[in-house]
Amino acid sequence: MKTLLLTLVVVTIVCLDLGYTRTCLISPSSPPQTCPKGEDICIVKARCDEWCLRRGPLIERGCAATCPEFRSNYRSLLCCTTDNCNH
């Protein structure tokens, strides 16, 4: 009986994905998205182009496997590891 119970527990664990998945914002007005497996970092990139002074920086939010490298056209870059931390 103990063997059967242990087998059922093991099968349940194998069949269910017990891995935690991160949720991040993709825009301020939409609900959070579940990040793909392996992408556990939420990011916010604010970058400038030739129209930056008129309309402001372009904001990109989402999930990433690693924190992107800061580039010269970024105004800011935020990488965080809690759910919906990229607001």
UniProtKB/Swiss-Prot annotation:
Q: List localization entries.
A: Secreted
* Pfam families from the UniProt entry: Toxin_cobra-type
Q: What keywords appear on the UniProt entry? A: Acetylcholine receptor inhibiting toxin, Disulfide bond, Ion channel impairing toxin, Neurotoxin, Postsynaptic neurotoxin, Secreted, Signal, Toxin
Signal sequence: where? 1-21
Tell me the tissue specificity: Expressed by the venom gland.
User: What InterPro entries does the entry give?
Assistant: Snake_3FTx, Snake_toxin-like_sf, Snake_toxin_con_site, Toxin_cobra-type
Q: Which cysteines are joined by disulfide bonds?
A: 24-42, 35-63, 48-52, 67-79, 80-85
Subunit structure comment from the entry: Homo- and heterodimer; non-covalently linked.
According to UniProt, the name of this protein is: Kappa-4-bungarotoxin
